[in-house]
């Protein structure tokens, strides 16, 4: 087992621990020798309490009437607003058909009068006027270009370029923010065009990528790399981890540096303190991409001037995929920030910790395929457990 903390890369339990009992025992010994127990061990032994949310009571709903897409059996489903609603059920019970194919597409068409046709249903009703935007936060890459990364997606790089352009050497040579862009001619390496690598086409094999010989993988011209902000050039900054960059920028009172720090902290909030600022989006996992998108919306809530008056309906499809127990806590805290701003969240999820933390549960079933497609429960997690006759209830 690896730990302790994101980006550490330390082995805290040996690979020859073949049983759960041995694994836990070995990990405890190793962790004790290091002066602390690993987070994994604390969660598995029940020594660390699960995150406890302040539950919200639903007052307004959006109702999907007559949902009949795929195996859905003409069901009416009410989705609460300004709450964390978790849609549960065994695989194949109809969750994605209901939430992705019907709710999301129907809401998008209602709000934008365009978009992909929703799945089969009769009507959309309820407090539709209380939602002015719908966002499906999926695990698709955050950008199609190899030059896209977390700081470009969160608009952090704009302030980084501005800071660099304000340095004496940059002013002396007439370098503006555009000279520190990957996407514009001027400062980027002309050989690799800001990628830091070149791609060599192979006729009968996959293309090969090699570090750009002209810039040595640094992406920019030598003169641009001479510009330094607090001793670091643009390449140094892009190679910092999120946590390193927060330490670096937070001690500067410059408004741009403070904005950078605030937005970087949203990446920490979603468990991404370890990624490099300039790390290409093509190297990020689907779960990491999804959490960067969540961080973007969290950053919108920081500055009142940037927060639009809309109340957004956020839809997530299994956001805990690949997450440690500790990261699930961070995810739930991030959800609470969005809810506190008046937004609404619907999550398709199997993770018991998320289901327990929900304000409202919509359980589909009772089984999969032709034996699924029914709404077998709607209510709080506590009511679901008390009812006790669905697969989800039994596992909770």
Model-derived features: positions:
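Conserved phosphate-binding elements of NTP-dependent enzyme cores
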Residues: 1-396
């Amino acid at each position: 087992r690896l730990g302790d903390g994101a980006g550490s890369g330390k082995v805290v339990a040996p690979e020859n621990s073949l049983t759960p009992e041995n694994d836990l025992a070995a990990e405890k010994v190793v962790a004790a020798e290091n002066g602390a127990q690993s987070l994994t061990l604390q969660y598995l032994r029940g020594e660390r309490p699960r995150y406890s949310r302040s539950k919200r009571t639903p007052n307004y709903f959006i109702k999907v009437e007559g949902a009949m897409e795929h195996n859905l059996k003409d069901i009416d489903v009410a989705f609460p607003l300004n709450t964390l609603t978790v849609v549960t059920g065994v695989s194949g019970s109809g969750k994605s058909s209901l939430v992705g194919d019907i709710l999301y597409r129907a809401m998008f068409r209602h709000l934008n009068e365009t978009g992909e046709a929703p799945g089969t249903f009769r009507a959309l009703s309820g407090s539709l006027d209380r939602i002015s935007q719908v966002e499906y936060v999926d695990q698709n890459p955050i950008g199609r270009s190899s030059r896209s990364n977390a700081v470009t997606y969160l608009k952090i790089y704009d302030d980084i370029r501005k800071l660099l352009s304000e340095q004496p050497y940059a002013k002396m040579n007439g370098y503006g923010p555009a000279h520190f862009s990957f996407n514009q001619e001027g400062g980027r390496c002309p050989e690799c065009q800001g990628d830091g690598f070149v791609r060599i086409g192979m006729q009968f094999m996959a293309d090969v990528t090699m570090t750009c010989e002209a810039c040595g993988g640094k992406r920019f011209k030598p003169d641009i790399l001479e510009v330094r902000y607090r001793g670091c050039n643009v390449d140094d900054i892009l190679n910092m981890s999120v946590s390193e960059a927060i330490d670096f920028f937070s001690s500067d009172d410059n408004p741009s540096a403070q904005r950078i720090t605030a937005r970087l902290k949203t990446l920490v909030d979603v468990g991404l303190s370890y990624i490099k600022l300039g790390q290409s989006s093509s190297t990020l996992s689907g779960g990491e991409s999804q959490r960067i998108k969540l961080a973007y919306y969290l950053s919108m809530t920081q500055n009142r001037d940037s927060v639009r008056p809309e109340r957004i309906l956020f839809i997530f499809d299994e956001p805990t995929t690949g997450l440690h127990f500790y990261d699930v806590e961070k995810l739930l805290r991030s959800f609470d920030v969005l809810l506190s701003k008046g937004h609404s969240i619907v999550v398709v999820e199997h993770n018991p910790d998320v289901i327990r933390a929900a304000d409202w549960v919509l359980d589909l079933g009772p089984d999969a395929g032709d034996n699924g497609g029914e709404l077998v429960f709607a209510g709080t997690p506590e009511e679901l457990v008390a009812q006790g006759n669905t697969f989800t209830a039994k596992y909770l």
